[in-house]
Amino acid sequence: MSSSAPIGVFDSGLGGISVARQIAKDMPAEHVLYFGDSANAPYGIKTPEQVRALSFDIVERFVRQGVKAVVIACNTATSAAVNDLREHYDIPIIGMEPALKVACDRGDVPSDPHHIPQRVIVAATPLTLRERKFATLMDRFDSQNTIFKEPCPDLVEIVESGRLGDHDLVMRTLHGYFDQYDMEHIDSVVLGCTHFVFYRDYFRELLPERAAVIDGNEGTVRHLGVVLESLGKLAPEGATGGVELANSDPSERIAELSRKLLNV
């Protein structure tokens, strides 16, 4: 596989555009093929078997297009399908997981040997929070920290329907999920869905100034770079990269919304 081959990036819909955008920013020589499966969104309320089948269909599409790696820019699809995809394909398959370690590590102070327990909300889809992969991740950190799981399916729908700019709707939806918590005593919110990255400014409005809003996009793209470099597959310096957008929903509304989110 040539180092100038593209990278395939997919999501259940439009959320993974936030990851494609991060790749374009951090790895500008890379050519990204983005595929959003908006016709089948949301994945977060489907069964793991349904998500696996959809994920395999998309990766097959990428393989036919000659990609050198695939990024599953979807926490839900990662939870349900990443292990099976890695067993089946001989190209790197990079997954996403909620950046819980980053949130909990904020309690480690270099000058103090004692961990400061963190109070963390993980906002994600229902399926991500139900899957064994997340339970295993949570088991690593919940003995020293207080971790709240908050499924937020409506946040996916708001992005997919193009209503992200409706401030009143978004804040009303966020308050519906998070007013049950004493936000003054929350240390961080982990955005465990790539759709939720587009809500970063709204979460900042919701949270006290000292609290962090954390997502896994930068770490995922950094890992992608390390993997490609180790294989000698980074695009040549000076190559003209970019992002090509495709979607299972062929409507102009989705195409226009995709372009808008890529350039937010």
Swiss-Prot record:
The keyword Cell wall biogenesis/degradation applies. Its EC number is 5.1.1.3. The active site is at C74 (proton donor/acceptor), C193 (proton donor/acceptor). Gene3D superfamilies: 3.40.50.1860. InterPro entries: Asp/Glu/hydantoin_racemase, Asp/Glu_race, Asp/Glu_racemase_AS_1, Glu_race. Substrate binds at D11, S12, Y43, G44, N75, T76, T194, H195. Pathway: Cell wall biogenesis; peptidoglycan biosynthesis. GO terms for biological process: cell wall organization; peptidoglycan biosynthetic process; regulation of cell shape. Keywords: Cell shape, Cell wall biogenesis/degradation, Isomerase, Peptidoglycan synthesis. It catalyses: L-glutamate = D-glutamate. It comes from the Bacteria. It is an enzyme of class 5 (isomerase). GO terms for molecular function: glutamate racemase activity. Provides the (R)-glutamate required for cell wall biosynthesis. Belongs to the aspartate/glutamate racemases family. NCBIfam families: glut_race. HAMAP family: Glu_racemase. This is Glutamate racemase. The lineage of its organism: Bacteria, Bacillati, Actinomycetota, Actinomycetes, Bifidobacteriales. The gene is murI.
